[in-house]
Amino acid sequence: MAGHHRIKAGSEDASAAVDFAESVCGSAADGTAANAGDDLDFPFGVTTRQFGPHEGEAVAIAHGKPDGRGVSLGRGEVTSVDPDGALLVQREMHSDGVYDAIGTERRAGDVAITRFKEGRWWYRTRYRGADGDRRGTYVNVCTPVEAFPDAVRYVDLYVDVVRRPDGEVERVDDDELDAAVADGLVGTELAQRARSTATAIERAL
C-alpha cells in the first residue's frame, strides 16, 4: 500500500485502517504489490480527507531539534488544505516583542500565516499586523515536513532565511549549523542539503 508507514504514523484510526485495507487487498509481504509500503507515494489528499487535519481544526507546530529536544511553536487554525500536500496554518500573536532574526516589532494581535507542504525541506511564515502591515517573512530550513492529524512535525536544521518589510533578505544561523556538525548532531551530507536549500531560498526571495 502506497504510504504504508507514513499513514500508520498519523493516528490509531489511520493505523487500523491500513491494517484492514492490506488484509483485504494484500500487501508487500504477500507479494501482491511491488511498491506496497513505499512512502514516496504518500497519498496526502486521501489521507488528510479521511483523518485530518481539516480546515477549521487546530494543529500544533512540533519543532524538533537534532539533539532530540522538542519545542512546540504553539497551535494554529488550519485555514486551507490542498490535495497536493500544502497546508496553511494561521496563528495569532498574544504578546509584544521582536520577531527573531527579522528584527521588527511584534505586537499582540499580529497574525502568523505559515505554509507547509508535505515532504518539503522548508516552510514559510509571513507575519502581518492586525491592520495588514507586513512585519516580515521567516523561512525555516528543516527535514521534510510531515502533516499529521494533530500536528505538523519536522526537525529544524538551524540555518534559515528572512525577508524584512523593506525587502532586505538575510540568511541566518549558519554558525549554529556549523556547530551542530562539529558536535556530531548533524551529518555532513544533511548539512550540505540544508545549506543548498537555504541558498536556493535566498535567491528566490
Where are these regions (language model features)?
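Acidic, polar-rich N-terminal leader regions of halophilic archaeal proteins
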Residues: M1-L205
